[in-house]
């Protein structure tokens, strides 16, 4: 898969793209990332990529010519998306990452200053994506997040496919709690079921924990995911058990 990042700060991506699973995926050729500076396509002697907004206002607006020219200079693979990173865009979530992972090429437009000339938004970008309801100094951090999230879904990046299937959001639920050695630390014990060797009981416990954790932390996810009768029962039992545990802790205080 090919990523092309249109950015005024190509050096921003150097170190993050060399480390971890993403770095290994790039080394193995699973994906490739190319950075293009729109300043190289500026049309004046000062290589300006921004100008004052028509109608007045604060800040500077990114000009259309350098961005259109930068994108036009790129080789194209099909299917391709040209993504503008903006707080006004579609929220980046796991479902969108999975959709984008099916593309052959993603071109990411990183903004700076007061934002983009509207013609970039309307006539160049094919999609707008937001990292969340907050404003950053530029689109580079959202671009890194998107690249990371997509690359790890590409075949060969993550060793065990089951690792992806059991993660938060893959099944519409948050991930279950994880434990490792030692079995007891500072008086806090690993749940006995995880030490039992009973794989069916472990799977049931994990699903119950996912349901309870999602209900408590992200109830909006459950609103989008109808529960089976078994899941409804597991959720009710899990909530009841946690309520009992809280009451017992209160009595010990």
Curated annotation (Swiss-Prot):
Q: Name one GO biological process term.
A: tRNA N1-guanine methylation
Q: Which gene encodes it?
A: trmD
Reaction catalysed? guanosine(37) in tRNA + S-adenosyl-L-methionine = N(1)-methylguanosine(37) in tRNA + S-adenosyl-L-homocysteine + H(+)
- Quick one: which residues bind S-adenosyl-L-methionine? 111, 131-136
> What EC class does the entry list?
transferase
EC assignment: the record states 2.1.1.228
UniProt cross-references to Gene3D superfamilies, sorted A to Z: 3.40.1280.10, tRNA(m1g37)methyltransferase, domain 2 (1.10.1270.20)
Q: What is its main location?
A: cytoplasm
Protein name per Swiss-Prot or TrEMBL? tRNA (guanine-N(1)-)-methyltransferase
Would the keyword Transferase be found if you checked this record's keyword annotation?
yes
One Pfam annotation, family name? tRNA_m1G_MT
Cellular component (GO) terms are: cytosol
Where is it located?
Cytoplasm
UniProt keyword annotations, A-Z: Cytoplasm, Methyltransferase, S-adenosyl-L-methionine, Transferase, tRNA processing
Molecular function GO terms recorded = tRNA (guanine(37)-N1)-methyltransferase activity
- In UniProt terms, what function does this protein have? Specifically methylates guanosine-37 in various tRNAs.
Q: Does the keyword tRNA processing apply?
A: yes
Classification via InterPro entries: Alpha/beta_knot_MTases (IPR029028), tRNA_m1G_MeTrfase_C_sf (IPR023148), tRNA_m1G_MeTrfase_TrmD (IPR002649), tRNA_m1G_MTases_N (IPR029026), tRNA_MeTrfase_TRMD/TRM10 (IPR016009)
Q: Which residues form the signal peptide?
A: none
Describe the family membership recorded for this protein in Swiss-Prot or TrEMBL.
Belongs to the RNA methyltransferase TrmD family.
The UniProt subunit note reads as follows: Homodimer.
């Amino acid at each position: 898969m090919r990523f092309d990042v249109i950015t005024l700060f190509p050096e921003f991506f150097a170190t993050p793209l060399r480390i971890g699973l993403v770095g290994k995926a790039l080394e193995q050729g699973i994906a490739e990332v190319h950075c293009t500076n729109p300043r190289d396509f500026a049309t004046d002697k000062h290589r300006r990529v921004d100008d004052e907004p028509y109608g007045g206002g604060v800040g500077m607006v990114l000009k259309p010519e350098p961005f259109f020219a930068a994108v036009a200079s790129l080789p194209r693979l099909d299917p391709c998306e040209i993504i503008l990173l903006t707080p006004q865009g579609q929220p980046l979530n796991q479902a969108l990452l999975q959709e984008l992972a099916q593309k052959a090429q993603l071109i990411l437009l990183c903004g700076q200053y007061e934002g983009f000339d509207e013609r970039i938004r309307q006539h160049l970008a094919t999609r707008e994506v937001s990292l969340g309801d907050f404003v950053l100094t530029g689109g580079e951090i959202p671009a890194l997040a998107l690249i990371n999230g997509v690359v790890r879904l590409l075949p060969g990046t993550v060793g065990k496919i089951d690792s992806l299937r059991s993660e938060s959001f893959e099944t519409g639920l948050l991930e279950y709690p994880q434990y490792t050695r030692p079995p007891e630390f500072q008086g806090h014990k690993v749940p006995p079921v995880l030490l039992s060797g009973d794989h069916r009981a472990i799977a049931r416990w994990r699903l119950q924990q996912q349901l309870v954790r999602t209900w408590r932390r992200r109830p909006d996810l459950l609103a989008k995911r109808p529960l089976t009768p078994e899941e409804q029962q597991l959720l009710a039992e899990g909530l009841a058990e946690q309520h009992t545990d809280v009451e017992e802790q209160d009595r010990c205080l």
